[in-house]
Amino acid sequence: MFHNLLGKNKIFSHHDRYVNDYIINVKDLSFAYAKKKVIDNVSFQVKFGEIITILGPNGGGKTTLIRILVGIYKNYLGIVEYAKNFVIGYLPQNFSVNSLIPMTVEYFLVSSYTKQRKKLNLNSVLKDVNVVKILNRQMSEISHGELQLVLLARCLMLNPDIIILDEPVSCMDINAKDSFYKLINQLILRYNLSVIMTSHDLHFVMANSYRVICINKSIYCEGSPSEIVKNEKFLKMFSSYA
């Protein structure tokens, strides 16, 4: 879906994918806006089945990194490698719905189907993400939390290998956040997924991530939640924007 990115891109074979378990390999990645560097020499790998959360301050490069991974930003320096026949489901930070265009949730999802990719059973996806009860409602009338679930269902319809989410719970209350993260963990097992997401919610990040990457233009530290909470660089970075 996003293999045709510019830059020094490579595609792993399926054999390579399962030998080393990596589905994304980022090496020496840099990106600049108007000569101002916002990503500086970033390298990391994503293993099959991981939940990785990217933490960092506003303006630290989290969203830029996500947009590079999904193919929106292409004029980067460095290498981004993907597994062969690799499909990404993307849930952006800001998704606007035109209230002047009548569109039910059901129509929005059905119209998202594409013939180029084998799709999962729609009814199964709708039940798993718990959006059946809002199918007849207008897209412009649903809450932000419901919109995130609809977008998540749309991602799953692509039968992706990984879902990349940019600040998916930023406008949810604490109960909705808890439910959303529990759902993500269930979907990983049911759909055989990997997940990358950005977040500011330290408590939920530590409870629901396999690995945490702390970024402020470059990577300050990374590791499991238990490792990160003991890292001085992490403590210093988080205290500055918490």
From Swiss-Prot:
InterPro entries: AAA+_ATPase, ABC_transporter-like_ATP-bd, ABC_transporter-like_CS, Metal_Ion_Import_ABC, P-loop_NTPase. ATP binds at residues 56-63. It holds the Pfam family ABC_tran. Its main location: membrane. It catalyses: Zn(2+)(out) + ATP(in) + H2O(in) = Zn(2+)(in) + ADP(in) + phosphate(in) + H(+)(in). SMART domains: AAA. Its EC number is 7.2.2.20. One of its GO terms (cellular component) is plasma membrane. It is a peripheral membrane protein. It comes from the Bacteria. It is found in: Cell inner membrane. One of its GO terms (molecular function) is ATP hydrolysis activity. Keywords: ATP-binding, Cell inner membrane, Cell membrane, Ion transport, Membrane, Nucleotide-binding, Translocase, Transport, Zinc, Zinc transport. Residues 24-241 form the ABC transporter domain. Part of the ABC transporter complex ZnuABC involved in zinc import. Responsible for energy coupling to the transport system. The complex is composed of two ATP-binding proteins (ZnuC), two transmembrane proteins (ZnuB) and a solute-binding protein (ZnuA). Belongs to the ABC transporter superfamily. Zinc importer (TC 3.A.1.15.5) family. This is Zinc import ATP-binding protein ZnuC. The lineage of its organism: Bacteria, Pseudomonadati, Pseudomonadota, Alphaproteobacteria, Rickettsiales. The gene is znuC.
